[in-house]
């Protein structure tokens, strides 16, 4: 508390943290930003990545659909949902939503949102993450991973590592 630094995110401590995260990810080219909370992160990420007519796909139990009091909808983006399977999204759900929105006069899906771990305490294995990412790539969708509970998943043997999450998603955060 006795040290003067420049504004949050621009100080030497944040730079050291960014350098450590880049080293863990084994990628010097990643963008790292510090935000104040999960809802704000979800809202900022979704609203900045999507155009006005685009939507995000989530399971019905997804945090952005149930617990964030309309934050995403406040930005003008619709959340398209499917009933979860143990709290999780599967590629078939994504494909089904894509088939349901073929018309230019409908909201256009552009992002898939998942949480690692889920609202039900389940988690995505590396293989499940790869399958979802492949489905997103096939459908030209971004994959966004809510990492508010990521620490719980990182200790599991068959869950993706941070490096693997960086490979098989377009954006994720560490809560």
Feature roles, as predicted:
Residues 1-175:
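Conserved PLP-enzyme active-site core in the AAT-like
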């Amino acid at each position: 508390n006795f040290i003067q630094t420049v504004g949050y995110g621009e100080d030497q401590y944040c730079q050291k943290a960014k350098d450590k995260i880049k080293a863990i990810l084994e990628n010097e080219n990643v963008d790292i930003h510090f935000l104040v909370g999960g809802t704000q992160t979800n809202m900022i990420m979704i609203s900045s990545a999507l155009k006005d007519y685009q939507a995000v796909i989530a399971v019905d139990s997804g945090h952005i659909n149930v617990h964030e009091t309309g934050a995403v909808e406040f930005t003008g983006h619709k959340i398209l949902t499917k009933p979860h399977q143990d709290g999780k999204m599967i590629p078939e759900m994504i494909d089904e939503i894509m088939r349901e929105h073929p018309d230019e006069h409908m909201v256009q899906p552009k992002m898939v949102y998942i949480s690692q771990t889920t609202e039900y305490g389940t988690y995505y294995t590396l293989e499940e993450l790869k399958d979802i990412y492949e489905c997103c790539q096939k459908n030209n969708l971004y994959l966004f991973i809510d990492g508010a509970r990521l620490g719980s998943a990182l200790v599991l043997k068959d869950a993706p590592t941070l490096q693997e999450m960086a490979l098989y998603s377009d954006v994720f955060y560490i809560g």
